[in-house]
Amino acid sequence: DCQERDPALSELFIVEGDSAGGSAKQGRNRKNQAVLPLRGKILNVERARFDRMLSSDQVGTLITALGTGIGRDEYNPDKLRYHKIIIMTDADVDGAHIRTLLLTFFYRQMPQLIERGFVYIAQPPLYKIKRKKQERYIDNDRHLSRVLIELGIEDVRMLNLDGSPALEDGKMAEVLKILEEVEHVAEAMARKSVDFDEYVKRYDPAANRLPLYRVRVIPPGGDVENQEIHLAFTDEEMRKIREDAEARMGPLDPSQFKWDELHLAPGLVKQFAQLQALGFGIPALLRNGAPIYEADVDGKKVPLFALGDLLDLVREVGRRGLSIQRYKGLGEMNPEQLWETTLEPTKRKLLQVQLDDAVRADQTFTVLMGDEVEPRRAFIEENALNVRNLDV
């Protein structure tokens, strides 16, 4: 616990595991920061009866720490002992699961704490980079990409194949920023099993548009591994895809024909226009067998087979002389590092949980932990490719 008794000045960190809990206890400000480590697996609140949930050691300790009581007769949010409840979990799948579970618990049992803005999620850094004696903490993969570009951009020149400059002075940073956004879209498409090159090839220059729908045709028997992925501009095109599939497979039930919108399409069209304004055609995004540009790195020529190669090269140059440490868990940080990055109020980053965040967590948890098999199977099918950086 902490020494402060004024809830408005007190913070409770709910920390995953003993190792991170130990570092947090040593690194915190004992005056107003309390730490509650969650040990072992938290109770599955979806399937457990209410009385059984209350008897869980983990949930019981949490309720005691909060001071609000629980249940119709005892719960009183005005008795909350901390006006900042900060969920601090690892940046991996287990951490996401625990965070989802805790948000579900607060949403179902103590919604007023979320409504009053008392629940937060800590944003610890994912990386620490070091060059010579300089150290820097990095929030996430996109932040790392930006930093590597900053470090590498001055040492790379982009050339046409005849050796002339392919970019005006000062335009490299602009191009790389656009290419980062395109890369982000390509990764999102890959998670939806959409081949990015094939998607770009469907660009309609006359109408300045890209396909808006992804259509999945699943063979009989639910054979998801052999599903067909189609792209469509219109409802009429989707209807034609269904007709063609039914001509081959017979009538399709709703579980065999699914579609969703590709919300990133309008943004990608805008990025195409930005690249064209800088003198790059859309085909330059597509890899082929021959170089289309080259880069000069310290006098050495490097072939570029697509614009994305330029982005990769600049980041590779930015890595030179750099030590990059990825934190698989909060327990890998010593108390001083945890204080500096995640506990210290003037430097840390917190996300305040909004009610719609908790609603989404509740819905996700209901799907994953409930007794309904079909929604869970559909969720896993849709999201299996979304999991990155698995620590196994």
Across the structure, where does each feature detected by a protein language model lie?
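Conserved phosphate-chemistry cores used by DNA topoisomerases
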Residues: 1-392
